[in-house]
Amino acid sequence: MTEIVALYGDPVAGNPTSIMQNAAFREAGLDFVYVDIRVSATELPAAIAAARTLGFAGLNCTIPHKVAVIPLLDGLGESARVIGAVNCVVAREGRFIGENTDGKGFLQSLRGEIDPRGREIVLFGAGG
């Protein structure tokens, strides 16, 4: 049976993640599909309930849901707890656990250029 993974956000039109994820699933031989689903702020609780009912393998959350999703989950991983926001929801043993890969991904890309330990930095961004 095909596993479903989705992006919940508003807006989601034009987001390239589904193209990348579906290509990666095919390359890895995984029977998964990644779909973009526009979910407004008021629809988020029902959308999380629907993902549970339909047995989604996981979700990505983008604006405006990264903080609002937290009380709708069964728990948080360390990264989401520290950052105070969720961008990934993983279904584990019937529970939805929030994670955050933004910080780890940023540091990994930065470490390819410099070692940030012990340095003061200025970070610019829009926070999405």
Descriptions of predicted regions:
Residues T2-I114:
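Phosphate/diphosphate ligand-binding glycine-rich loop within oxidoreductases
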Residues D102, G127-G128:
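Short acidic/polar capping segments at secondary-structure boundaries
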Residues A6, V122-F124:
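Conserved beta-strand elements of the Class I
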Residues D10, A126-G127:
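Glycine-rich Rossmann-fold phosphate-binding loop(s) that bind the pyrophosphate
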Residues D115-E120:
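Short helix-loop-beta connector
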